[in-house]
Amino acid sequence: MKSTAISRRYAKSLVNLAAPDGQLESTYTQLEQIQQAFACEPRLYKLLASPTLAADKIAGLLEGIGNYLQLSTTLRNLLGLLQQRQRLEYFDALVADYRELADVQLGLVRARVCSAAPLDAEVQQAISAQLQKRYGKQAVLELAVEPELLGGVRIEVAGQVLDGTIRSGLRRMAGYLNS
């Protein structure tokens, strides 16, 4: 989901509340739990977003979600506020914005690393070390296996794509030969 000024504002406020207590990671984990609950049970989201549902029913539903997911008071309040202001539609963007802002606070850079086969620990460490050297932040790798890459790796980090795959090399060569 695309970031908006609204989602960014809520995410920034949430980071400001979580950071002093060292709760940035646990807050993100809880945000992911809420996101998964909405994804697994779309009716839950629809009920909360419904303007026709009685306030006491919504309060009970929010209380039930908070208890079931063992949410912090801050996240219970956030859900209530988003529901009350009819801004639940921004929740996914808020989660993405929160992750980005929390990473800045924690000095992290996230990288999606795609390869044709699983990477061994030594290669993962080498990639992480190079990214840390390049960006000056601790790298968190999100690994994915995509057999269609044929070989090599593609790294997506900080809005950039570093493509060292055989597939992209073959594509470049074909373009060169066709020109």
Swiss-Prot record:
It is a peripheral membrane protein. Gene3D superfamilies: N-terminal domain of the delta subunit of the F1F0-ATP synthase. GO terms for molecular function: proton-transporting ATP synthase activity, rotational mechanism. InterPro entries: ATP_synth_OSCP/delta_N_sf, ATPase_OSCP/dsu. One of its GO terms (cellular component) is plasma membrane. It is found in: Cell inner membrane. It holds the Pfam family OSCP. Keywords: ATP synthesis, Cell inner membrane, Cell membrane, CF(1), Hydrogen ion transport, Ion transport, Membrane, Transport. Belongs to the ATPase delta chain family. F-type ATPases have 2 components, F(1) - the catalytic core - and F(0) - the membrane proton channel. F(1) has five subunits: alpha(3), beta(3), gamma(1), delta(1), epsilon(1). F(0) has three main subunits: a(1), b(2) and c(10-14). The alpha and beta chains form an alternating ring which encloses part of the gamma chain. F(1) is attached to F(0) by a central stalk formed by the gamma and epsilon chains, while a peripheral stalk is formed by the delta and b chains. PANTHER family: ATP SYNTHASE DELTA CHAIN. NCBIfam families: ATP_synt_delta. F(1)F(0) ATP synthase produces ATP from ADP in the presence of a proton or sodium gradient. F-type ATPases consist of two structural domains, F(1) containing the extramembraneous catalytic core and F(0) containing the membrane proton channel, linked together by a central stalk and a peripheral stalk. During catalysis, ATP synthesis in the catalytic domain of F(1) is coupled via a rotary mechanism of the central stalk subunits to proton translocation. This protein is part of the stalk that links CF(0) to CF(1). It either transmits conformational changes from CF(0) to CF(1) or is implicated in proton conduction. This is ATP synthase subunit delta 2. It comes from Syntrophotalea carbinolica (strain DSM 2380 / NBRC 103641 / GraBd1) (Pelobacter carbinolicus).
